[in-house]
Amino acid sequence: MAGLAARLVLLAGAAALASGSQGDREPVYRDCVLQCEEQNCSGGALNHFRSRQPIYMSLAGWTCRDDCKYECMWVTVGLYLQEGHKVPQFHGKWPFSRFLFFQEPASAVASFLNGLASLVMLCRYRTFVPASSPMYHTCVAFAWVSLNAWFWSTVFHTRDTDLTEKMDYFCASTVILHSIYLCCVRTVGLQHPAVVSAFRALLLLMLTVHVSYLSLIRFDYGYNLVANVAIGLVNVVWWLAWCLWNQRRLPHVRKCVVVVLLLQGLSLLELLDFPPLFWVLDAHAIWHISTIPVHVLFFSFLEDDSLYLLKESEDKFKLD
C-alpha cells in the first residue's frame, strides 16, 4: 500500500542511474565486456556458449552478452577491492551473486513470499467473509491486483529487462491507485455509489495516460517519480485521516493505522543503501522481507472491516 510508493521512489532513483554508474563507466569493465563478446558471442564460439549454457538460463533469457557483463562485473569488483576502494554499482545496481537464473535471489524470493502471503490471505478472506459483504468484491479485486504486482516484482528481480522493469513499475503504480480506490469505496462509496463510479473512471484514465506516456512516448524517470510520490501521498493521507477519525468507533481500524505507519517506517530501510551482504542481501531485499507480515496485517484489517460492514448492513435490514 503506502510502502509501494516509497519503493517506487527509490526504484526511480536507481533507474535514473541505470544509464551509467561508476562500475560500468570503468574502462576496465568496458574493455572486458568488448573483449569477451568478440571472443565468445559470435560464430563458432557463440554456438559453443549455447551448447554449454544450462537450459534454465536460456529459458530465462540470459544471453552471451549478459554473461559477459556478469563476469566482467566481478572482474571489476575484484580490482576495486584489491585497490582498497568501495564496491561500485553497475547500471544503477549493486553487484549480486547470481543463483541459477535469479539475478537478485533474495529480492526475488522475498517478492514471491509477499505474493504467497497475499494469496493465503485472499483464500482466508474468501473463506470467512461472505460475498454479500458490501466491500467483498472490492477487497478481492485489490488482492488480485496485489498478487499481479508481486508476480512482476518476482519476475523483475529474477531477470531485469526493459519489459520486466516497466511491468514492475506499472503494476506497483496500479496497486497504489487501487488502494486509493479501495479507500474511496470504504469512506465514500458505500453511501454514494455514483461518486465511486466517477472516481473509478478517473483513476482508470490516469493509469491509462500514465502507462501510455511512459510506454509510447518516453520512459521519463523524473515524471514517474513525481507522479508516484503524489499518488502515494494521497493514499497515505486519505487512509490515515479516515482511520484516525474512526478509531474510537471502530477498534479494528487500528490495524490499518499500524500498517500505514509500519510501511512508512520500514521504507527507511531503503535509505540504508549498502553493498549486498554475502553478495545476496541488500537493503531492498530486507525491505521486501519485512513487508510480508505487514501485508498479512492489512488483509486481516480488510477481513475484520468487511465482517463489521456485513453485520451493520444485516442489522440495518432487520430494523427496516
UniProtKB/Swiss-Prot annotation:
EC number: 3.1.1.-
Gene Ontology CC annotations of this record: endoplasmic reticulum membrane; Golgi membrane
Group of enzyme by EC: hydrolase
Tree of life domain: Eukaryota
Residues spanning the signal sequence: 1-20
GO molecular function: hydrolase activity, acting on ester bonds
Known glycosylation sites: N40
Keywords, comma-separated and alphabetical: Disease variant, Glycoprotein, Golgi apparatus, GPI-anchor biosynthesis, Hydrolase, Intellectual disability, Membrane, Signal, Transmembrane, Transmembrane helix
Effect ascribed to mutating H284Y: Found in a patient with Toriello-Carey syndrome; uncertain significance
Pfam family, one: Per1
Cytoplasmic side stretches: 120-135, 191-193, 246-257, 300-320
Residue spans crossing the bilayer: 99-119, 136-156, 170-190, 194-214, 225-245, 258-278, 280-299
The keyword Lyase appears for this protein: no
One Gene Ontology biological process: GPI anchor metabolic process
Matches recorded under InterPro entries: Per1-like (IPR007217)
UniProt KW Chloroplast keyword: no
Lumenal domain ranges by topology: 21-98, 157-169, 215-224, 279
Effect of D305G: In HPMRS4; results in partial functional impairment; the mutant does not localize to the Golgi apparatus but is retained in the endoplasmic reticulum
Intracellular or extracellular location(s): Golgi apparatus membrane
Tissue: Ubiquitously expressed, with highest levels in thyroid and placenta.
Predominant location category: Golgi
Similarity annotation: Belongs to the PGAP3 family.
Miscellaneous remark of the record: When transfected in S.cerevisiae, it can complement the absence of yeast of PER1 protein, suggesting a conserved role in lipid remodeling steps of GPI-anchor maturation.
Disease listed for this protein: Hyperphosphatasia with impaired intellectual development syndrome 4: An autosomal recessive neurologic disorder characterized by profound developmental delay, severe intellectual disability, no speech, psychomotor delay, postnatal microcephaly, and elevated serum alkaline phosphatase.
Function in brief: Involved in the fatty acid remodeling steps of GPI-anchor maturation where the unsaturated acyl chain at sn-2 of inositol phosphate is replaced by a saturated stearoyl chain. May catalyze the first step of the fatty acid remodeling, by removing the unsaturated acyl chain at sn-2 of inositol phosphate, generating a lyso-GPI intermediate. The fatty acid remodeling steps is critical for the integration of GPI-APs into lipid rafts.
Protein name: GPI-specific phospholipase A2-like PGAP3
Classification lineage: Eukaryota, Metazoa, Chordata, Craniata, Vertebrata
